[in-house]
C-alpha cells in the first residue's frame, strides 16, 4: 500500500495546501488509492478529476484494468451522488429510469488511472475501485467546503452535483 500511496501522491500533484480528498482500499489482493479534485460554489459541487492508482500484481491486460477502475469509480460515484430508493405506502417510488436517476456517462469526471508495475501474482480488478471513490470525493468536498457529508446520497446533506 505504501508504494500505491507514494505513486498516487506524485501522479495527482498532491502537496501541502491542495484541497483534495483521498481514500484507499484493499480487496481481492489489490491496492487502490483515489485522489479527488472537486470545486464548489456553496453546496453546488463539481467533480473535476479522479486520480486512481492501482496495484493488482502483474498487469495482464492494462486496458481491462483501466476500464474496471473507471467503471468501479462510476459505481462508487453513483452511490455518493444520486442513487436513492424511496418508499411511499410500502411501495418503491422509483419504478423506471424516469424516476430513478443513475449516474450517466455524461456525469463522469476525467479519470486518470495509474497501474503500478509489479512482479506479484495478478489479482482482482473487478470491484476494488468502488469502495474508495465516494469517500475520496466526500473528503474533497470537506476540504473545499468545510462540511462533512453524513448521509448518502449527498443530496441528503444538502449538496447538489453539478
Tell me the role of every PLM-derived stretch:
Residues 1-162:
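Cofactor-binding beta-sheet edge motifs in enzyme active sites
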Amino acid at each position: 500500500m505504501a508504494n500505491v500511496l507514494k505513486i498516487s501522491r506524485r501522479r495527482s500533484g498532491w502537496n501541502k495546501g491542495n484541497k483534495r480528498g483521498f481514500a484507499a482500499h484493499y480487496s481481492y489482493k489489490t491496492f487502490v488509492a483515489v485522489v479527488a479534485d472537486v470545486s464548489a460554489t456553496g453546496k453546488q459541487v463539481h467533480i473535476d478529476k479522479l486520480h486512481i492508482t492501482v496495484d493488482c500484481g502483474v498487469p495482464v491486460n492494462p486496458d481491462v484494468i483501466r476500464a474496471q477502475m473507471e467503471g468501479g469509480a462510476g459505481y462508487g460515484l453513483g452511490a455518493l451522488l444520486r442513487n436513492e430508493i424511496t418508499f411511499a405506502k410500502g411501495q418503491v417510488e422509483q419504478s423506471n429510469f424516469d424516476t430513478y436517476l443513475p449516474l450517466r456517462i455524461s456525469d463522469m469526471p476525467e479519470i486518470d488511472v495509474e497501474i503500478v508495475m509489479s512482479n506479484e501474482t495478478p489479482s482482482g480488478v473487478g470491484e476494488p475501485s468502488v469502495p474508495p471513490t465516494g469517500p475520496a470525493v466526500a473528503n474533497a468536498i470537506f476540504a473545499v467546503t468545510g462540511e462533512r457529508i453524513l448521509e448518502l446520497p449527498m443530496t441528503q446533506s444538502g449538496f447538489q452535483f453539478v
